[in-house]
Amino acid sequence: MGVEIKLTDNQLPVSPVFIDFLLHIVEDIPFEGAQWGDQLSEVMLSDQRRIVDEAPENAKRVLSHKKGQAAIGRAYQLLLALLTGDVDAIKDIQLKFHFINVIGIPRNGGSYLTKELYRSMGYDPTRVPNVIAHDGFPDAGPFRFEKGVNSWVSSLQTMAEYLTMVEIYFGKNKPHSGKIVVPKKLLKGTYAGGFFHRILGQAVENILTVRHPVASCISTYEKSGGLPEDGKFAVRGNIEDWVRRDLIYTGVEPDDLEKMDYFDAYLRYWEQYNYYVATTGLSANRAISIVAYDKQRMENVIKSFYYRFGNINPEPEQFEVFDKRDRHPDWFEKAEPVIKRVSEVWATVGLEFPLEEIMEGW
């Protein structure tokens, strides 16, 4: 008995960011002006809306080129491989590319590390597109099932599109120690650790960035325009939207979330996110470096990559750190037992949480 299942691009449409990437490729539009690596800017970027709005027209332009047609076909081919467990198709990618993933909660120094990783390899980070280097793609997160959305399928499809972009963007690069190196800021890697571990390859390198939750929270609300006047949680930017999403996923009622103190909501998000590091399969990969937020520690990590890629006199950009440890002393008291719980959970899977360094409060 044979059953034939047909899915079209109506059920599985191509992602707008993939279309935007391919448009640059097929029309030889240079990638330039990328701002994902800016340490100091607190501006919330809105380029995503433009990409979505322009996607229908841009898709026509991409499909008018054979190269664009081939890339979209390749992405669907890889999606089928992921859906059906075609291990050999994925193994070919694993044997060619070596992924270095920078993983951590937002505002933990991951953008700096990713940018300097690219610089250590000779790239101008402003010419590396956001979809290649930074957060958001491939997609992963708390499970969603609603009209037109199955987040597990979304993870598979965006992974297929990401791998297609990796082949296009990095495929002709010179290998280092036998493989082509692909740096990626993978904020969402904790939500599906086993998935990223198995698909990107068991030899993948992970760099985990960790920061004190009070400092992370301050940086988050500053990104969104400041602490709300009433001190209550509010959604004004992407990070706060992820806080809302994650808390609702684990049982917080939306009405109750609006009444929560800003730091209480953020602290719960911080705790959950760092639990995922230990509980979703990410820890199965033992090529993990853990770096606690601090100027010297961050710069030392980057210098090691400059040495590794042949620069004997590395001059990485300085990592900017601002001392705000005099703010919110009551928050520090609330955070201490949470930090210790995370440390204990990490220990259950053999990960050493940098407790002493985190308690410095940076």
What label would you give each PLM region?
Residues 5-8, 15, 189-315:
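PAPS-dependent sulfotransferase catalytic domain
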Residues 101-104, 124-128, 182-185, 205-210, ...:
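A structural signal for short, well-ordered beta-strand segments and their strand-loop junctions
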Residues 109-110, 211-212, 322-327:
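Alpha-helical hinge/cap motifs
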